[in-house]
Amino acid sequence: MRGLFVTGTDTGVGKTEVACALVRAARAAGLDAVGMKPAQSGHVAGEPSDAERLREASGGVEPLEAICPYTFAAPLAPAAAARAEGREVSLARVVEAARALAARHAAVVVEGAGGLLVPLTARETHADLAAALGLPVLVVARAGLGTVNHTALTVEALERRGLPIAGIVLNRTGPEDDPSVPLNAAEIARLTHREPLALLPWEPDIARRARALGSVLAAKIQF
């Protein structure tokens, strides 16, 4: 399977917008890429869900249930959200859905929920999913204070499991003036021996931000 697994150091770090930007950039370059969200939970009514955003970035070529096999109401990790509804997530079903997309498209960008060790099923985490898919992992991290620890821990967890790392992207998700931002990339590189691929700038205009992310990521990430 060709593609990427997009994980985060936390929830709310911008995984979905990075995954969407990657899909759009790949498609603009002529690569038939499609996004996938194995499980989503806690969708806010009146706003597009992560899966809907990925479907739109993918050109709307797949039905929503192919993009996202599991949807839950409660804003919880997938395993907990499934339990709350008397349901269970199957890793095998998610892998089968990803392989089905890979059979129809040249590349699949899979966006996890939360961070790497967030429980996906009653027994497996998103790290187990990344391993089962065999995709290199792109780590999306916040750019500001606290990211050094979160990013180093995520990289360590990936390395301990022998999972390939496609890179680290630091993402500014707001206009806050944080004096740690210019320093964090170098500190992460020192601790992990991995230079972050990009520091994505903050842009309040959603359309311009999407274009900016796409251009930066297209130049840095190949899959």
Swiss-Prot record:
<comment type="pathway">
    <text>Cofactor biosynthesis; biotin biosynthesis; biotin from 7,8-diaminononanoate: step 1/2.</text>
</comment>
<dbReference type="InterPro" id="IPR027417">
    <property type="entry name" value="P-loop_NTPase"/>
</dbReference>
<feature type="binding site">
    <location>
        <begin position="111"/>
        <end position="114"/>
    </location>
    <ligand>
        <name>ATP</name>
    </ligand>
</feature>
<dbReference type="GO" id="GO:0000287">
    <property type="term" value="F:magnesium ion binding"/>
</dbReference>
<dbReference type="GO" id="GO:0009102">
    <property type="term" value="P:biotin biosynthetic process"/>
</dbReference>
<keyword id="KW-0963">Cytoplasm</keyword>
<keyword id="KW-0479">Metal-binding</keyword>
<dbReference type="Pfam" id="PF13500">
    <property type="entry name" value="AAA_26"/>
</dbReference>
<comment type="subunit">
    <text>Homodimer.</text>
</comment>
<keyword id="KW-0547">Nucleotide-binding</keyword>
<dbReference type="GO" id="GO:0005829">
    <property type="term" value="C:cytosol"/>
</dbReference>
<comment type="similarity">
    <text>Belongs to the dethiobiotin synthetase family.</text>
</comment>
<keyword id="KW-0067">ATP-binding</keyword>
<feature type="active site">
    <location>
        <position position="37"/>
    </location>
</feature>
<feature type="binding site">
    <location>
        <position position="16"/>
    </location>
    <ligand>
        <name>Mg(2+)</name>
    </ligand>
</feature>
<keyword id="KW-0093">Biotin biosynthesis</keyword>
<protein>
    <recommendedName>
        <fullName>ATP-dependent dethiobiotin synthetase BioD</fullName>
        <ecNumber>6.3.3.3</ecNumber>
    </recommendedName>
</protein>
<feature type="binding site">
    <location>
        <position position="111"/>
    </location>
    <ligand>
        <name>Mg(2+)</name>
    </ligand>
</feature>
<comment type="function">
    <text>Catalyzes a mechanistically unusual reaction, the ATP-dependent insertion of CO2 between the N7 and N8 nitrogen atoms of 7,8-diaminopelargonic acid (DAPA, also called 7,8-diammoniononanoate) to form a ureido ring.</text>
</comment>
<feature type="binding site">
    <location>
        <begin position="171"/>
        <end position="172"/>
    </location>
    <ligand>
        <name>ATP</name>
    </ligand>
</feature>
<dbReference type="GO" id="GO:0005524">
    <property type="term" value="F:ATP binding"/>
</dbReference>
<keyword id="KW-0460">Magnesium</keyword>
<feature type="binding site">
    <location>
        <position position="50"/>
    </location>
    <ligand>
        <name>ATP</name>
    </ligand>
</feature>
<dbReference type="GO" id="GO:0004141">
    <property type="term" value="F:dethiobiotin synthase activity"/>
</dbReference>
<keyword id="KW-0436">Ligase</keyword>
<feature type="binding site">
    <location>
        <position position="50"/>
    </location>
    <ligand>
        <name>Mg(2+)</name>
    </ligand>
</feature>
<dbReference type="InterPro" id="IPR004472">
    <property type="entry name" value="DTB_synth_BioD"/>
</dbReference>
<feature type="binding site">
    <location>
        <position position="41"/>
    </location>
    <ligand>
        <name>substrate</name>
    </ligand>
</feature>
